[in-house]
């Protein structure tokens, strides 16, 4: 049987780049990697309601720059920037270095695979019919300009005794085409019947130039996201 690998990992270095962008020698690499994991865990825990899709960590000399991609930047910033100051202190406690937090607003969350997957998972937890949740997400993505979308839901769907997998697809999702700009996201719904897994693939067109930063540039220049605020 053919298995589907993570389409983001397959395209790293082609039209997508890493979410942790720094270099370290073998003596420090493990320590910095653990710091990255802790930073992401804390931010996702603190920003559950902020619709965070992606956290990019860069480490210039003796600094740590964290870029949070969120559909609700106001929730991240808080009243008069109070919440973002708390986040900066928590991250600084982990890294023991100067921390800069940037926020990028995702203007079309319906085209972000991670946010779509989390939205469907939340609906499953609220006992919304899984077919309705999947169909609504597919229609929203296609209406806003996606060239294709596929959604998989697996588990005890609708409280069934036997777990199964259901999927919807509209348009085309060319997983083998390396120049394809495919976003991928996963989420888990914790229902009273057990856990249900949600996977989402969204095809946004092709990136013809060979540039690892191409996907980030497209997001910055296009309508999907825009810088909201730089917090020094």
From Swiss-Prot:
GO terms for cellular component: cytosolic small ribosomal subunit. HAMAP family: Ribosomal_uS3_B. Keywords: Ribonucleoprotein, Ribosomal protein, RNA-binding, rRNA-binding. GO terms for biological process: translation. One of its GO terms (molecular function) is mRNA binding. Part of the 30S ribosomal subunit. Forms a tight complex with proteins S10 and S14. It comes from Rhodopseudomonas palustris (strain BisB18). Transmembrane segments: none annotated. This is Small ribosomal subunit protein uS3. InterPro entries: KH_dom, KH_dom-like_a/b, KH_dom_type_2, KH_sf_prok-type, Ribosomal_S3_C_sf, Ribosomal_uS3_bac-typ, Ribosomal_uS3_C, Ribosomal_uS3_CS. The keyword Magnesium does not apply. The keyword rRNA-binding applies. Residues 39-107 form the KH type-2 domain. Belongs to the universal ribosomal protein uS3 family. CDD domains: KH-II_30S_S3 (cd02412). Binds the lower part of the 30S subunit head. Binds mRNA in the 70S ribosome, positioning it for translation. Pfam families: KH_2, Ribosomal_S3_C. PANTHER family: 30S/40S RIBOSOMAL PROTEIN S3, SMALL RIBOSOMAL SUBUNIT PROTEIN US3C.
């Amino acid at each position: 049987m053919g298995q589907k690998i993570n389409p983001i990992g397959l395209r790293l270095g082609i039209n997508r780049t890493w979410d942790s962008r720094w270099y370290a020698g073998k003596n420090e690499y493990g320590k910095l990697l653990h710091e990255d994991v802790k930073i992401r865990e804390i931010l996702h825990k603190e920003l559950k309601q902020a619709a965070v899709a992606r956290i990019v960590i860069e480490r210039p000399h003796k600094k740590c720059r964290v870029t949070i991609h969120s559909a609700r930047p106001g929730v991240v910033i808080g009243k008069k920037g109070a919440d973002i100051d708390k986040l900066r202190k928590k991250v600084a406690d982990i890294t023991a270095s100067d921390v800069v937090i940037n926020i990028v607003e995702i203007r079309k969350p319906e085209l972000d695979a991670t946010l779509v997957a989390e939205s469907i998972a939340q609906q499953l937890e609220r006992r919304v019919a899984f077919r309705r949740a999947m169909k609504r997400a597919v229609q929203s993505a296609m209406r806003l300009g996606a060239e294709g979308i596929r959604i998989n839901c697996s588990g005890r769907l609708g409280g069934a005794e036997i777990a199964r997998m259901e999927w919807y697809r509209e348009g085309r999702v060319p997983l083998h085409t390396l120049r394809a700009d495919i976003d991928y996201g996963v989420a888990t719904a914790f229902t009273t019947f057990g856990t249900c897994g949600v996977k989402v693939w969204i095809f946004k067109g092709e990136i013809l130039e060979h540039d690892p930063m191409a996907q980030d540039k497209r997001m910055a220049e296009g309508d999907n996201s825009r810088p909201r605020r730089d917090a020094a």
